[in-house]
């Protein structure tokens, strides 16, 4: 079957591209998923997230189900439990609760998700095998042999690399280049330490972002809205008016850390006229969000209030109570309306809040629960803000942040804009629009929110990515991930510690199985096509699909969990297809964090293209282009949106590791030549994305960075 593609360097007659899939396997595309025999099919108001490779195809597969799926986006559906037997070959069941449906539920729903109950398995199921059988005949793309020349990278100093860029610009933006959690803190800290960089600012988003920083004494601080520069003497830190803030949470969780550590923030932390995240915004988030889709920080609801001009800003709290009451009363209509539609009482809301906190992680604060219980909710909030904010002597100073940043630039000082989340989590990016945050967290969004004159002041973007173990947390498509984004939540795994400690605990063995068996022809250039085989990994706890094993092992071994939610992040390969667009929009500079992880890998992988394949033969129209089975999407082609990306499978280029020549700061001699594997990886990323790599992270400490000569 001829391959159809969209733009790029190659056409349908290029060697290794035409007839990308074996016609004997794909003619007519007969493969289609079927629910397990005897189970009730899920009925939803929209297509389920089509992660086909994890669908249980037959009754034999279904017999091994024991997961505890959570709620699917905005719907609850009935599910028949086939069996709660442990995963195949296991000695004992995993410590996740089996799903139980309430057949007598008057609403016709249950607490279980039929899609995930029938779709996800720990082991390799028949559906995964069928997908692989269709793709295994894909002809190797010529790009798998690129780049032909491996660059040599030499180490240089901070002063001769990063600081030259800082000194040539007025506004420096540090931005996430993937889906957040890229390790931006090191680069922020390095830029902030420059003598001319006097102002560090957060200019949008809210406490759904999170970063961990350490002071010189080694004390740990976890900040969400507070800029990282608070720990550096002589720096002024700002939270701009386009940010959204829960001032009670900000005082209780962030400012209290500074107070307890004896850090004087009075002349170093300033807050603009931010939009206020109220308790009802957080409850709206809880009541209206799908499992694993939100940090429960009220982001979407408060941005809704902001756009509708119905909410309150910080200045309202510091002025007359009557105006505050009227605005709160009007804005709260949305909350009361949702309770009415869902037929929920205050007691129901309190119960749901306590259920959310039942595992010991406080996702819904006490004062939010107290609000839900309050009879006069408006008066409750007026008093809450009067006592905890307006009359709180510890509340930081307020100012016109835009004016102060502009004044600093006119004095010749540098301004650092600390980007929350990332490019692909930005609400302004249509590709992942349904699973993004609610602010524009691209570099363009940062600059717009700062309200600094981009024609007057010279700006630069420092993009940050992470490899190996590029990760995403939350729902949505991510073709390069080892498992679907909702895989962990479907097992009722809310935090990293919910993962059974003995499961896939031998990271060394798991990664070896992936690269040895998952890519059986990796050493044969004529046969390696970059498609991962659905092989299995076994340990004393059971047998697991290699993608599942790598997802669990990576999350545990690398400590990959959300800084805010503690949810396990889903790891995968560095994605050149996605980063090419990031580089086009806000490149070319890139720093790669955590590259010393590669010291423990036999090989490292980078996704250089996707192949579109839907066993049902489903076609997806994106921006007027219809994606069909066999389409190849290369780095440099337009990135399709999520409806198509759910059907995309990664084509992975493998690069030999550097175990014998580790780069970790604790093991490497400064200025020692970088291993060939590192140079090959960096060369591949630069080749496929056109970026310019400034530095690589090689350890946990703030100064564990190798700067590269340009």
Curated annotation (Swiss-Prot):
The protein, known as: Adenylosuccinate synthetase
Keyword Magnesium: yes
Compositional bias annotation for Polar residues: 10-25
Residues at which GTP binds: 180-186, 210-212, 569, 697-699
Organism: Leishmania major
Residues binding substrate, per UniProt: 563-569
Protein's job: Plays an important role in the salvage pathway for purine nucleotide biosynthesis. Catalyzes the first committed step in the biosynthesis of AMP from IMP.
Cofactor needs: Mg(2+)
Subunit record text: Homodimer.
Further comment: Parasitic protozoa lack the de novo purine biosynthesis pathway and rely exclusively on the salvage pathway for their purine nucleotide requirements.
Residues annotated to bind IMP: 181-184, 208-211, 295, 309, 421, 437, 567
Region annotation (Disordered) ranges: 1-54
């Amino acid at each position: 079957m001829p391959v159809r593609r969209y733009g790029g360097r190659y056409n349908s007659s290029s060697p290794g591209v035409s007839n990308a899939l074996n016609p004997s396997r794909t003619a007519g595309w007969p493969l289609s998923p079927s629910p397990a025999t005897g189970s009730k099919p899920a009925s939803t108001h929209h297509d389920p997230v089509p992660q086909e490779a994890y669908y249980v195809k037959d009754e034999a597969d279904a017999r091994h189900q024991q997961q505890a799926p959570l709620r699917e986006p905005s719907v609850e559906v009935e599910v028949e439990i086939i069996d709660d037997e442990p995963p195949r070959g296991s000695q004992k069941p995993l410590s996740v609760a089996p799903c139980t449906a309430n057949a007598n539920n008057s609403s016709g729903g249950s607490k279980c998700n039929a899609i995930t109950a029938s779709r996800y398995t720990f082991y390799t199921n028949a559906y995964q095998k069928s997908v692989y059988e269709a793709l295994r005949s894909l002809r190797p793309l010529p790009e798998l042999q690129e780049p032909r020349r491996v660059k040599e990278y030499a180490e240089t100093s901070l002063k001769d690399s990063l600081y030259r860029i800082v000194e040539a610009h007025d506004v420096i933006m540090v931005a996430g280049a993937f889906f957040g959690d890229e390790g931006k803190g090191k680069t922020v800290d390095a830029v902030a330490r420059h003598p001319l960089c006097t102002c560090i600012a957060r200019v949008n988003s809210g406490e759904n972002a999170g970063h961990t920083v350490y002071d010189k004494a080694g004390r740990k601080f976890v900040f969400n809205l507070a800029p990282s520069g608070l720990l550096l003497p002589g720096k002024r830190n700002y939270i701009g008016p386009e940010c959204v803030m829960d001032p009670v949470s900000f005082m209780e969780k962030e400012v209290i850390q500074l107070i307890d550590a004896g850090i004087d923030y009075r002349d170093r932390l300033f807050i603009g006229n931010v939009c206020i995240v109220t308790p009802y915004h957080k409850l709206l988030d809880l009541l209206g969000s799908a499992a694993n889709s939100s940090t429960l920080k009220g982001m979407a609801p408060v941005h809704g209030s902001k756009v509708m001009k119905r909410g309150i800003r910080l200045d309202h709290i510091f002025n007359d109570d009557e105006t505050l009451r009227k605005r709160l009363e009007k804005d709260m209509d949305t909350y009361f309306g949702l309770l009415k539609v869902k037929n929920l009482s205050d007691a129901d809301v309190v119960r749901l809040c306590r259920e959310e906190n039942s595992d010991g992680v406080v996702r819904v604060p006490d004062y939010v629960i107290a609000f839900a219980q309050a009879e006069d909710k408006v008066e409750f909030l007026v008093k809450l803000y009067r006592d905890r904010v307006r009359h709180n002597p510890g509340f930081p100073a307020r100012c016109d942040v835009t004016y102060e940043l502009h004044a600093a630039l006119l004095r010749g000082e540098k301004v650092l804009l600390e980007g929350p989340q990332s490019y692909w989590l930005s609400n302004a990016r249509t590709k992942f629009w349904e699973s993004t945050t609610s602010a524009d967290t691209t570099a363009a969004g940062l600059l717009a929110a700062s309200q600094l004159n981009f024609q007057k002041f010279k700006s630069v973007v420092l993009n940050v990515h992470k490899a190996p173990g590029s990760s995403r947390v939350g729902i949505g498509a991510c073709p390069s991930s080892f498992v679907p984004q909702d895989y962990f939540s479907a097992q009722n795994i809310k935090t990293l510690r919910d993962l059974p400690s003995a499961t896939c605990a031998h990271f060394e063995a798991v990664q070896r199985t992936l690269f040895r068996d998952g890519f059986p022809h990796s050493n044969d250039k004529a046969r390696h096509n970059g498609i991962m085989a659905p092989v299995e990994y076994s340990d004393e706890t059971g047998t697991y699909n290699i993608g599942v094993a790598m997802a669990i092992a990576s999350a545990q071994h690398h400590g990959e969990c959300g800084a805010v939610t503690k949810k396990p992040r889903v790891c995968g390969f560095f994605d050149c297809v996605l980063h090419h667009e990031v580089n086009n929009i806000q490149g070319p500079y890139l720093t790669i964090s955590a590259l010393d992880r590669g010291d423990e890998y036999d090989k490292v992988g980078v996704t250089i293209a996707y192949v579109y394949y839907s066993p049902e033969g489903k076609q997806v129209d994106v921006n007027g282009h219809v994606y069909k089975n066999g389409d190849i999407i290369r780095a440099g082609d337009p990135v399709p949106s999520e409806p198509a990306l759910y059907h995309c499978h990664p084509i992975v280029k493998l690069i030999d590791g550097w175990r014998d020549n580790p780069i970790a700061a604790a093991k490497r001699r400064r200025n020692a030549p970088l291993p060939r594997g590192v140079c090959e990886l960096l060369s591949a990323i630069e080749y496929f994305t056109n970026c310019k790599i400034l530095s690589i992270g090689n350890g946990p400490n703030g100064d564990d960075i190798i700067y590269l000569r340009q």
